[in-house]
């Protein structure tokens, strides 16, 4: 949905020309099969948002422009305005627009203006999906955000994966929202997130195409990178 499809033909040509070393992501090396599609997330997100009749808050990684576009698309399809909350969300949106993305989406409205819309006509896309203390989601859930408030019957969609180490504070946040009568939707309950990192089969196929003489595993804990090296020898 964002950017061009992978150029398999060119990667295979590069592999035939000879590659000394390849640096590759280890994050999802323990995940079987292939990583999913953002298009599938978009379809399910639309189904989820269509059934929700109150205020919706979506929290995700600001850097995930494809997910941002999904939020804009689903807001428009469900007859809602969308408002961005959080400095990094605004910064990434501006950068994406400057690079030619998000051109065919509705214009976001200011959170202060969003307060004038009825609950079923607005969706907020905010930062803080990992429970960051100063993230917009934490401030909203603590009822200290100056422009965005949440109340019983509303819904929060955590459209992101829990980064290892953040489990305790995120589940605490989930529990607090549920206690306040707010519906919590996450990848545990609905298909609202797909990883942008390659799974095991994706990694295997890439190495078959590129055929590097050396592999440098990165982006993961030590156990991920050791497993990545083991995968190469399977």
Residue ranges and their predicted role:
Residues 33-34, 59-61, 192-196, 217-218:
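Glycine- and other small-residue-rich loops at beta-strand/loop junctions that grip anionic moieties
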Residues 19, 54, 203-220:
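Proline-aspartate-enriched helix->loop->beta-strand connector
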Residues 181-196, 202-203:
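Generic long, charged, amphipathic alpha-helical segments
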Residues 25, 59, 83-86, 125-127, ...:
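Generic beta-strand/beta-sheet core signal
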Residues 232-234:
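Conserved small/polar residues in nucleotide/adenosyl-binding loops
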Residues 27-29, 63-64, 89-90, 129-132, ...:
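Short, glycine-/Ser/Thr-/acidic-enriched flexible segments
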Residues 1-116, 135-147, 168-170:
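His/Asp/Glu-rich metal-coordinating catalytic cores
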Residues 148-150, 161-181:
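Redox- and metal-dependent alpha/beta enzyme cores, enriched for Fe-S-associated oxidoreductases
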């Amino acid at each position: 949905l964002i950017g061009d499809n992978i150029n398999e033909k060119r990667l295979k040509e590069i592999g035939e020309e000879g590659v000394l070393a390849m640096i590759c992501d280890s994050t999802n090396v323990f995940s079987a099969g292939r990583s999913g599609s953002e298009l599938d997330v978009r379809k399910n997100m639309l189904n989820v948002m269509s059934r929700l009749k109150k205020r919706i808050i979506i929290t995700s990684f600001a850097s995930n422009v494809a997910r941002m576009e999904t939020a804009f698309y689903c807001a428009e399809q469900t007859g809602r305005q969308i408002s961005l909350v959080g400095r990094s969300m605004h910064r990434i949106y501006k950068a994406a627009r400057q690079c030619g993305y998000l051109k065919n989406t509705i214009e976001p409205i200011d959170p202060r203006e969003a307060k004038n819309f009825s609950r079923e006509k607005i969706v907020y896309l905010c930062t803080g999906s990992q429970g960051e203390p100063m993230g917009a989601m934490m401030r909203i859930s603590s009822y200290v955000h100056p422009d965005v408030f949440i109340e019983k019957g509303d819904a929060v969609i955590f459209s992101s994966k829990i980064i290892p180490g953040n489990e305790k504070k995120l589940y605490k946040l989930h529990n607090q929202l549920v206690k306040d009568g707010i519906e919590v939707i996450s990848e545990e309950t609905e298909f609202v997130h797909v990883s942008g990192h390659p799974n095991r089969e994706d990694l295997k196929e890439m190495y078959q195409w590129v055929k590097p003489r050396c592999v440098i595993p990165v982006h993961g804990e030590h156990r991920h990178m050791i497993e990545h090296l083991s995968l190469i020898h399977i």
